[in-house]
Amino acid sequence: MAKTAIAYKEKMKELSMLSLICSCFYPEPRNIAAYTFDDMEVKQLNKRASGQAFELILKPPSPVSEAPRTLASPKRKDVSLEEIQAKLEAAEERRKSQEAQILKQLAEKREHEREVLQKALEENNNFSRMAEEKLVLKMEQIKENREYYLASLMERLKEKERHAADVRKNKEQLELSG
């Protein structure tokens, strides 16, 4: 009895809910292992947990089917010498036009490169001139500061010399009077 219950449980797991409901209405099992379409038949070979396998059977072509049609290439019309010459001239004009367009694009590109180079040189010159002006101003400022510093040192030195002279003079007067 336990084996029957286990087998029933396994069968219930395999069946979908729709199959379960349908099995209540139709007690005999349906063969859902084969499906038929217009020109083929699909048979289910086996069903496993890892996947399913199918066999695809193509029906032979019916005798009424049409034979494959071969498409006839359109007839070539005779081309005159004038038409060939006109086509060649048009092709030559197209080629010349393309060459002229390419040359024009190259000239524009060269002109743009020249403008970019000129602008870079101009910016470089401006930068150099500005840097030189800044350097000259800085050097002038340093020179002025140095002159001011030296002048202040000389002034202090003169002040010390005057003070030393006053001290000597006072000392001499003390020695003479004393």
From Swiss-Prot:
A Pfam cross-reference name: Stathmin
Membrane topology summary: Peripheral membrane protein
Stretches assigned to coiled coil: 75-178
Superkingdom, natural source: Eukaryota
Molecular-function GO terms, alphabetical: tubulin binding
Compartmental location: Cytoplasm; Membrane; Cell projection, Lamellipodium
InterPro entries in UniProt: Stathmin_CS, Stathmin_fam, Stathmin_sf
Presence of the UniProt keyword Transferase in the record: no
Keywords: Cell projection, Coiled coil, Cytoplasm, Membrane, Phosphoprotein
GO biological process per UniProt: cellular response to nerve growth factor stimulus; microtubule depolymerization; negative regulation of microtubule polymerization; neuron projection development; positive regulation of neuron projection development; regulation of microtubule polymerization or depolymerization
Annotated ranges, domain SLD: 38-178
Family: Belongs to the stathmin family.
Protein name per its UniProtKB record: Stathmin-2-B
UniProt organism field: Xenopus laevis
This protein's encoding gene: stmn2-b
